[in-house]
Amino acid sequence: MTSKKLTEKPLKRRRFMKTAVGLTLAPIAIGLWGCGGSNSTSTSSTASNSSSSNNDTDSNAEPEEDFDGWASGGTSAMTSDFPDDSLFDTASVCSVALTGSQTEGPCYFQSDYLDDISYEQTGLPMMLCLQLIDEACNPLSGYEIEVWHCDVDGVYSGDTSDSADASGFNSAFCTGNEVDALSAKWFRGIAVTDASGRINLKSCFPGWYSSRAIHIHFRIRRNNTDQLVSQFGFSDSFCQDICTNHPDYSHRGEPDTLL
């Protein structure tokens, strides 16, 4: 699949994470591009665009040359704008494949409409760019796309006080009953697709928790009706690189579960 590069500094470049996802409906398919980092492949039961036809969502990225290590400092360290729609360019002929649903999991509760979902938490800055298209590769506007994931320590936020739907949330499991997590809403957010079928979110690369590979949950809604609930993840080597070399992740070491 295609990959892009993100240059953050003219002299010493640090690797930010820029992730682009192409989501298609009717039938639903998903393609994932990661930019500014190592090659990565997701774990969700999805299929990529015409550049790849396996049963995984692929996230391919070329490492920056002469980089000065992974960026840190959370979303406040971002110095570049979101990339234009050429990020999603693939083949000249439209070809999509089915995306399977994945479990919602026990850590979901409905969140807020946000551009930056980090709530000033630390971590590897990540641009999450998602584009929703139909089976003819036409963009779909007016759809809600919601994402949620854990922090660098593998902990989910747990402040459900303003949530319209927290019926399935397992607070003890997801927050570990940590005081900070119980009062937080970090790494959760909703955005509505624009005329290009696209949303842009600022976040940080998620950490890991026992028995799960690193992943991000997402759901797509139209007129308050779920169109898809699923997850995507990243290749073992990509996650190992971050968890071994990034100061915000290295204290926990490599994930205990890989793809």
Which stretches of residues belong to each language-model region?
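Beta-strand-dominated extracellular/periplasmic modules and repeats
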Residues: 60-259
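Bacterial lipoprotein signal-peptidase II cleavage site
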Residues: 35-43
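Residue-level detector of intrinsically disordered/flexible regions characterized by low predicted structural confidence
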Residues: 7, 11-14, 51, 56, ...
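A generic alpha-helix propensity feature with a strong bias for hydrophobic helices
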Residues: 30, 50-51, 66, 109
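N-terminal secretory signal peptides
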Residues: 1-15, 21-33
